């Protein structure tokens, strides 16, 4: 249909469990019903699901396990199959097929893998199949994890070319303060840009079952909106919430998409989880933010992490604030060696060069 839209729905652990230790199947049935109704109307639906660890813990009878990464991955390995079976069973009631996609950060960092994931996701949608996406928690290490399903959902929205991203949670939306401890807190209904003031009031969820809080939802909204995707944070327990969002009814907190969205390559740069981090001096900060300049080695103060040439890195100012993301022209070891030096010295220091800049302005997104 001509007015068909693509919606990515992220379902957090607190929504799927209702705050308990087990999946709330009755509630999941209702969420699937809403999605199926939209699917029947010609809309394209993508599910980003949490809950694998909770499903694994329930299936194994809530075993007492040490609080280690291995234990979580054990539970995820058991729970992931149970979770996907549940989604398949419920969507099949409406004659809808699903397709599972397990992603890691590596799928987003590498441009070719990013494009492959995009093509797979869009092929599923083109064939009226509902993609069900989760991070591959059973094998992902800290180095290759996106980290939380909020940011994963923003990346999925970019991959899908979505019109809207809906982050369902156990809160009504983003408030001026934590409503659990401050009765004067007010719901923020509309946001037209994520800034430091907004970041400072985004407290973390008290749910012990998931990995994302309100701060990660804010990060996801920022990424999606700058890619031209409206983002809504709303309560997963609100009746008819998914349909309301598609109809444009005001629910929760709406983050309005940037009027001039990033072009495709820069969407990838902005959305890709950084492989490392560099800190730059005040001169470099001003040059990038005020004049749109490339980053020269001279302005680099320190390099954190190990990354390859061509990977996306985070650029921070001296106060530790994330000011830009960009594709590094040099690997981390090379950047450490040329940091603080003039560009004319690169060849003498390294014995080779890939140009005078560390990060070119055409491969950079300022925040």
Swiss-Prot record:
Subcellular location: Cytoplasm
Main subcellular location: cytoplasm
Residues the entry annotates as binding substrate: 50, 137, 149
SMART domains given in the database record: PUA
GO molecular function: ATP binding; glutamate 5-kinase activity; RNA binding
Matching HAMAP family: ProB
Keyword annotations of the record: Amino-acid biosynthesis, ATP-binding, Cytoplasm, Kinase, Nucleotide-binding, Proline biosynthesis, Transferase
The family this protein is said to belong to: Belongs to the glutamate 5-kinase family.
Enzyme Commission identifier(s): 2.7.2.11
The encoding gene: proB
Cysteine pairs bridged by disulfides in the record: none
Species of the source: Salmonella typhimurium (strain LT2 / SGSC1412 / ATCC 700720)
Protein name as annotated: Glutamate 5-kinase
């Amino acid at each position: 249909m001509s007015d068909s839209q693509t919606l990515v729905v992220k379902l957090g652990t607190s929504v799927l469990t209702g705050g308990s230790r087990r999946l709330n199947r009755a509630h999941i049935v209702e969420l699937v019903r809403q999605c199926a109704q939209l699917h029947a109307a010609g809309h394209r639906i993508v599910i980003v699901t949490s809950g694998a660890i909770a499903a694994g813990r329930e299936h194994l009878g809530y075993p007492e396990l040490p609080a280690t990464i291995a234990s979580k991955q054990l539970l995820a390995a058991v729970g992931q199959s149970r979770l996907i079976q549940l989604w398949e069973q419920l969507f099949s009631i409406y004659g809808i097929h699903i397709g599972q996609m397990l992603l890691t950060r590596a799928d987003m960092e590498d441009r070719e893998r990013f494009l492959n994931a995009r093509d797979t996701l869009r092929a599923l949608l083109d064939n009226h199949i509902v993609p069900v996406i989760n991070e591959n928690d059973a094998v992902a290490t800290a180095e290759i994890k996106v980290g939380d399903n909020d940011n994963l959902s923003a990346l999925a929205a970019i991959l899908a070319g979505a019109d809207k991203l809906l982050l369902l949670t156990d809160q009504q939306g983003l408030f001026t303060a934590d409503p659990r401890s401050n009765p004067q807190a007010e719901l923020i209904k509309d946001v037209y840009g994520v800034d430091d003031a907004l970041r400072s009031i985004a407290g973390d969820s008290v749910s012990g079952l998931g990995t994302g809080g309100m701060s990660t939802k804010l990060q996801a909204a920022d990424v999606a909106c700058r890619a031209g995707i409206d983002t809504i944070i709303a309560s997963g327990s609100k009746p008819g919430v998914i349909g309301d969002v598609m109809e444009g009814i005001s629910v929760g907190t709406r983050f309005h998409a940037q009027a001039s969205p990033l072009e495709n390559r820069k969407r990838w740069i902005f959305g890709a989880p950084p492989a490392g981090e560099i800190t730059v001096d005040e001169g470099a900060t001003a040059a990038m933010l005020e004049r749109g300049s490339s980053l020269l080695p001279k302005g680099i103060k320190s390099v954190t992490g190990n990354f390859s040439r061509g990977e996306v890195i985070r650029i921070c100012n001296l106060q530790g604030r994330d000011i830009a993301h960009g594709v590094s022209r040099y690997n981390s070891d090379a950047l450490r060696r040329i940091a603080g030096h003039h560009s004319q010295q690169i060849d003498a220091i390294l014995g080779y060069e890939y140009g005078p800049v560390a990060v070119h302005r055409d491969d950079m997104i300022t925040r």
